Amino acid sequence: MAEIINGKEIAESILNNIKKEVENFDVKPTLAVIIVGCDPASKVYVKNKIKKSEFLGFNSILKELPEDIQKEELLDVIKNLNNDKNVNGILLQLPLPKGLDEKDFLDEISPIKDVDGFTTYNSGKLFKGEKPYSIACTPKGIIKLLETKNINLEGKVAVVVGRSNIVGKPVAICYCKKMQPLFRRIPKQKTYLKF
């Protein structure tokens, strides 16, 4: 029997618990968000991230950069945030404008400050079954929803739709030891993955 999970209620509970924890910190955490260009969807995501971080009691820094920024300039912004001892987390909003390849920038973020878990270090730790500093938020949210509802995937067959580095792969990796292996054809690839 299918059950609809109210993610908003669970998220609100988690946020309130985090807010209480942050109130007991000696120093307020600081999140730096970098957005390049003026993609409307990215602007909405960034606005919501800043709003949530401030609700939690975090300081936030928003770096709004022009679409025509040069590679070296963006690398300098990341380097400065890495070196800023007051900044605890860095988030580079994706997608980047045409002409800027995210691969050139994500690994420049310190793994300790990598809020999204997108650096090779953090995603590599996850892939190896080790504990990364951070896991991408959507897979982490999915896992938290399942855990909150006491949904045990051990020994079950589960289909992970998608294979992106942001959602599909991390979800599959997080649960691959608990799920029965499943062969799935990847559209447009003529390949099969075993999860």
Question: Where in this protein do the model-derived segments appear?
Answer:
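Short beta-strand elements in bilobed, periplasmic/extracellular small-molecule ligand-binding domains
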Residues: 53-67, 182-184
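Positively charged, low-complexity intrinsically disordered leader regions
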Residues: 1-27
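Short beta-strand segments enriched in small/hydrophobic residues
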Residues: 28-38
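Conserved active-site and cofactor/substrate-binding residues in soluble primary-metabolism enzymes
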Residues: 5, 9, 13, 44, ...
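Glycine-rich phosphate/diphosphate-binding loop of Rossmann-like nucleotide-binding domains
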Residues: 36-50, 133-195
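Non-catalytic terminal and connector segments of soluble metabolic enzymes
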Residues: 55, 82, 109-112
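Anion-binding alpha/beta catalytic cores of soluble intermediary-metabolism enzymes, centered on
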Residues: 91-153, 157, 171
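Short, well-structured alpha-helical segments in soluble
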Residues: 73-84
